[in-house]
């Protein structure tokens, strides 16, 4: 099944040890499977989740899709951006995404936006139908100062985006 749009907030730092045999068998399928670009460390399945989403993108080159591709917005912690040395599974997955020119933007959000954790999070925008002015580029948006304090904390969630903050971030993205 292919999708036009996908939105996700997978759990942060979830290990995939219980699915290890299945994942490694799928990896052996190469790019005919979902995990051909590589396998991340076993203690964080975020990039497996993203590879699964990428495998569900419509191919704009296929006649039946009439030039339509797909767009993905996914919220991650910093792990998919920063972990893994050169040549590691994480590094190979990121390289595969960038070499295919699918990563459109990364938006750094304020900390303390989630109930169970105060960590910084990032929205990755992924597309296989980039606008001409975005081809070969990745937009980095620092939205870490775009927040307001909540009247009452909810666990570790102390900050929130107002409508004005969302508009500002959207303008930064749109005016690229």
Question: Residues of each region from the PLM?
Answer:
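A conserved structural/catalytic subdomain of Rossmann-like adenosyl-cofactor enzymes
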Residues: 2-176
């Amino acid at each position: 099944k292919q999708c036009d749009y996908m939105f996700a907030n997978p759990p942060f730092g979830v290990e995939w040890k219980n699915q290890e045999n299945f994942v490694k068998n799928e990896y052996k399928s190469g790019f005919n499977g979902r995990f051909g670009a590589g396998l991340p460390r076993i203690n964080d399945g975020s990039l497996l989740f993203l590879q699964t989403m990428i495998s569900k993108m419509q191919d704009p080159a296929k006649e039946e899709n009439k030039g339509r591709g797909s767009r993905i917005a996914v919220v991650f912690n910093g792990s998919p951006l920063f972990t893994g040395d050169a040549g590691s599974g994480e590094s190979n997955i990121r390289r595969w995404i960038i070499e295919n020119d699918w990563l459109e933007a990364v938006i750094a959000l304020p900390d303390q936006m989630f109930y169970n954790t105060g960590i910084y999070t990032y929205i990755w925008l992924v597309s296989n139908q980039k606008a001409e002015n975005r081809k070969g580029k990745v937009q980095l948006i620092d939205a870490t100062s775009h927040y307001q304090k909540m009247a009452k904390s909810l666990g570790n969630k102390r900050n929130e985006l107002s409508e004005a903050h969302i508009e500002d971030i959207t303008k930064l993205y749109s005016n690229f």
